[in-house]
Regions:
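Short, small/polar residue-rich loop motifs at catalytic or cofactor-binding pockets
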Residues: 9, 120-123, 189-191
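Internal maturation/activation junctions in enzymes
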Residues: 43-142, 151-155, 162-163, 170-171
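Alpha-helical support elements that line or immediately flank enzyme active sites
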Residues: 39, 208-233
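Extended C-terminal subregions enriched in glycine
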Residues: 132, 184-185, 218, 227-260
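Long, well-ordered, tryptophan-enriched scaffold segments
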Residues: 1-27
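Active-site rim segments in enzyme catalytic domains, especially the processed small/beta chain
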Residues: 134-204, 228, 232-233
Length: 260
């Protein structure tokens, strides 16, 4: 697989959130989880919901649960199966998912799985911009400390270990999970640099670290800027919500119960 690998140009995908186009990486990554969450949350008027209020936290967490249920079911290498991007990112589908959110009660069960541990981090994020508006949004992770622990001879770097994120169970019995291991296939992975453009022009280059926290963090940065009127420094410094307990795309079959 390594000898046959060739880099490729990946077209980012976007949704419009209250007049702002938010751009993320498509599967085999998880960038569209942030876009799905924004589509769901766009149906709520956050100009009337205080930042950090119980209602703000509740709506954010419920949107995350719904998006991550799809993350576990559909996000995988598109070269090995159809990923229904247009459907997942449609406003119509977001409206259907939004209708599942109760204003005063948490979703008690969303199938399936559990998230990865987030207490220890192995990711770095960097962004830079020049006076002409050229931006770089860069994220890198070996996955779990020293990655695979293997260094190609004479090259001076260690290979990452994202293959751990393949599904291994049930892959030889149908129907197989879309993220099942196969030769030449890319595993689901979590690293997602992002951009925001406005009226076709660059506005913000951003990203966060932390596995399943990344789409949650992206959504909160966008909401802080667009909904809560924060400047860039405030949006980055503001306290963040992190929800654990949603479905996971790497083979765990235990459903989320009791609202995560």
């Amino acid at each position: 697989d390594l000898a046959a690998h060739q880099g490729e140009w990946v077209e980012p995908v976007s949704v419009n959130y209250r007049g702002y186009d938010v751009w993320e990486l498509p599967p085999n990554s998880q960038g569209i989880a942030a876009l799905q969450m924004l589509n769901i949350l766009e149906g709520f008027d956050f100009s009337k919901i205080p930042f950090g209020s119980a209602e703000h936290v509740h709506l954010f967490v419920e949107a995350k649960k719904l998006a991550f249920a799809d993350r576990a079911r559909f996000y995988a290498d598109p070269d090995f199966g159809k990923v229904p991007l247009d459907w997942l990112l449609s406003k119509e589908y977001a409206a259907q998912r939004r209708a599942l959110i109760s204003p005063d009660r948490a979703l008690r069960e969303v199938q399936p799985g559990t998230p990865p541990e987030l207490e220890e981090g192995d990711t770095i994020y960097l962004t830079t911009a020049d006076a002409d508006g050229m931006m770089v949004s860069l994220i890198q992770s070996n996955y779990r400390g020293m990655g695979s622990g293997m260094a190609p001879h004479g090259l001076g770097f260690i290979l990452q270990d994202r293959g751990e994120m393949f599904v291994l169970e049930g892959c030889d019995t149908g129907p197989a999970h879309p993220n099942c291991y196969a030769s030449g296939k890319r595993p689901f992975q979590t690293i997602i640099p992002a951009f925001i453009t406005r009226d076709g022009k660059p506005w913000v280059s951003f990203g966060v670290m932390g596995g399943a926290m990344q789409p949650q963090g992206h959504v909160q940065i966008v909401m802080n800027l667009v909904d809560f009127g924060m400047n860039l420094q405030e949006a980055g410094d503001a306290p963040r919500i992190q929800h654990e307990g949603s479905t996971d795309p790497t083979g765990a079959a235990t459903p989320m119960r009791d609202g995560g």
